[in-house]
């Protein structure tokens, strides 16, 4: 499948945390290109309505100890929403409450 026509949209939360982490526009382009190869290849997070998590290198840590980007690919809109980012040593996983909120957000994105 050709994913090259996908548009990326960043939530304000994602943009703020990306900048706070000191990541660059070049880092963002690398991330987008990795996701574009196959947006469905990253593991889906159970209970979120299709949100996926991709590992990214951060600082001196590789992908495993680095950061996590949370995103969702809305096929019908040909749009990938970059929802959140967190650094592994600051947070391990999304809480149940965060998953519920993100699931509602995905439903709104699909409808709108």
Question: Each PLM stretch: what is its role?
Answer:
Residues 1-26:
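Arg/Lys-rich, positively charged N-terminal/basic patches that mediate binding to nucleic acids
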Residues 1-3, 15, 34, 48-51, ...:
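Membrane-topology and secretion signals of cell-surface/extracellular proteins
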Residues 12, 55-57, 86:
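Anionic group-transfer/hydrolysis microenvironments
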Residues 13, 23-43:
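Compact soluble domain cores
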Residues 34-63:
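A short, surface-exposed loop/turn module that caps and links secondary-structure elements
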Residues 64-69:
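Short, surface-exposed coil-to-beta transition loops
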Residues 73-112:
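Enriched for short, Lys/Arg-rich terminal
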């Amino acid at each position: 499948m050709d994913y090259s026509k996908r548009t990326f949209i960043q939530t304000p939360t994602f943009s703020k945390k990306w900048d706070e982490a000191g990541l660059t526009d070049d880092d963002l382009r690398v991330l987008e290109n990795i996701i574009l190869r196959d947006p469905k290849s990253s593991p889906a997070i159970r209970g979120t309505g299709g949100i996926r998590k991709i590992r990214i290198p951060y600082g001196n840590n590789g992908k495993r100890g680095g950061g996590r980007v949370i995103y969702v690919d809305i096929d019908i809109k040909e749009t990938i929403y970059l929802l959140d980012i967190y650094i592994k040593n600051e947070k391990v996983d999304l809480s149940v409450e965060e998953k519920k909120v993100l699931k509602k957000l995905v439903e709104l994105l699909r409808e709108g």
